[in-house]
Amino acid sequence: MIENCNIRGFERQDLARLQEIRAAAYEPVFESFRRIVGEKIAQVALSNSEREQAELLRHICEATSSHDVFVVELGSEIVAFCSVTFDQASKVGEIGLNAVHPDFQGRGIGTGMYEWALDRLRAAGMHVATVGTGGDPSHAPARRAYEKAGFGAAIPSVYLYRSL
């Protein structure tokens, strides 16, 4: 983790900033998806993607959620967030929705955040950690950060679209 970073648990007043980070970090991803599938399909299949992701973040930040959410502060500013889940039966932990604000990417914050998350998973008794990400060019920075944190074995997955 880089100097001056602090990781702490999510607090309710953090949600607006996490939504800002999510929107900024995922903008190129949604743009890439629209380019890949084409405008005709995107208008139907992806029309609610940003709103659905915003709702997902709101949901996983609820006190009743099964997700643990933490934030990364650089100085007094929240610059990243990550969610994790623990499956005690299978001993598999998952890094879920996460993002580093684009203004702070490329500084090792993501890698440090994932290493911290992996330490949490180990401490909770997990034996395996998983994370899902896209295979398109817009996800390349995330893939690199996951690989730096030690992820390697991957099962490829492809979503196919067509107009009807």
Residue ranges and their predicted role:
Residues 36-40, 132, 147, 164:
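Residue-level signal for alpha-helical context at structural boundaries
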Residues 1-3, 147, 153-164:
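Acyl-donor-binding surface of acyltransferase catalytic domains
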Residues 100, 106-119, 144, 148:
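Conserved acetyl-CoA-binding loop-helix of GNAT-fold acetyltransferases
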Residues 13-14, 108:
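Short helix-adjacent coil turns
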Residues 111, 123, 127, 135-155:
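Conserved active-site alpha-helix within GNAT-family acetyltransferase domains
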